[in-house]
């Protein structure tokens, strides 16, 4: 495997920002399909792939999402071309015979609600992070958020299923005029050590 170019690293990490304001420019559905085609290849435990994604685009879908949003996230989410609900399928293990066929991985989870919860949350969070990086790689900007009422989102979008919401990500083409100055980040010695 080779190292990415400095310009690619810059696009994915160094110059990429969390956007709160959006250009009035639509995101094509074909690009969202491509986004999932990249995201799905990020690693998860036993290839469990518990994340489920709802791309909220239409005015009707936005209206269903709106009552679940915290006040601070309302305007920017309504203005975003797309809001992704990153959900987690609490019955993900039912798909393991297909996704992880070389072991009886379903039996590791069946009846173990605590392990299901931990695995679904951890791995759907990973998949949401892959989605953010894939979006940046495809020229989109992202604004992840956790300020929302999960029960309301679940009732509006996942009723009658085993899927629960994890977090939200606004997607589109960011308006740089809406950016705050970049906040500080930790240095290596503040957060890491080598043993």
From Swiss-Prot:
Assigned keywords, A-Z: Flavoprotein, FMN, NAD, NADP, Oxidoreductase
Cofactor(s) this protein requires: FMN
One Pfam family cited in the UniProt record for this chain: Nitroreductase
Enzyme Commission number(s) of this protein: 1.-.-.-
NAD is among the record's keywords: yes
Gene3D superfamilies listed in its UniProt record: NADH Oxidase
InterPro entries: Nitroreductase, Nitroreductase-like, Nitroreductase_HadB/RutE, RutE-like
Keyword Nucleotide-binding: no
Molecular function GO labels: oxidoreductase activity
Taxonomy, superkingdom: Bacteria
Transmembrane segments: none
Family stated for the protein in its record: Belongs to the nitroreductase family. HadB/RutE subfamily.
Family matches, as HAMAP family: Oxidoreductase_RutE_HadB (MF_01204)
PANTHER family: MALONIC SEMIALDEHYDE REDUCTASE RUTE-RELATED
Name of the protein this chain belongs to: Putative NADH dehydrogenase/NAD(P)H nitroreductase Bcep18194_B1060
């Amino acid at each position: 495997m080779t190292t990415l170019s400095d310009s690619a690293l810059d696009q994915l990490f160094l110059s990429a920002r969390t956007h709160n304001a959006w250009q009035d420019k639509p995101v094509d559905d074909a690009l969202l399909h491509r986004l999932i085609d990249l995201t799905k290849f990020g690693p998860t435990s036993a290839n469990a792939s518990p994340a489920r994604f709802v791309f909220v685009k239409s005015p009707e879908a936005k209206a269903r999402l709106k009552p679940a949003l915290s006040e601070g996230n309302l305007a920017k989410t309504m203005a975003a071309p797309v809001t992704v609900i990153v959900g987690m399928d609490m019955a993900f293990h039912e798909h393991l015979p297909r996704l992880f066929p070389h072991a009886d991985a379903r039996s590791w989870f069946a009846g173990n609600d605590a392990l299901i919860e931990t695995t679904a949350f951890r791995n759907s969070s990973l998949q949401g992070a892959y989605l953010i990086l894939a979006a940046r790689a495809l020229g989109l900007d992202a604004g992840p958020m956790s300020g929302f009422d999960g029960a309301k989102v679940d009732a509006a979008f996942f009723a009658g299923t085993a899927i629960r919401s994890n977090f939200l990500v606004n997607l589109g083409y960011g308006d740089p005029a809406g950016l705050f100055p970049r906040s500080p980040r930790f240095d290596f010695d503040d957060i890491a050590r080598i043993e």
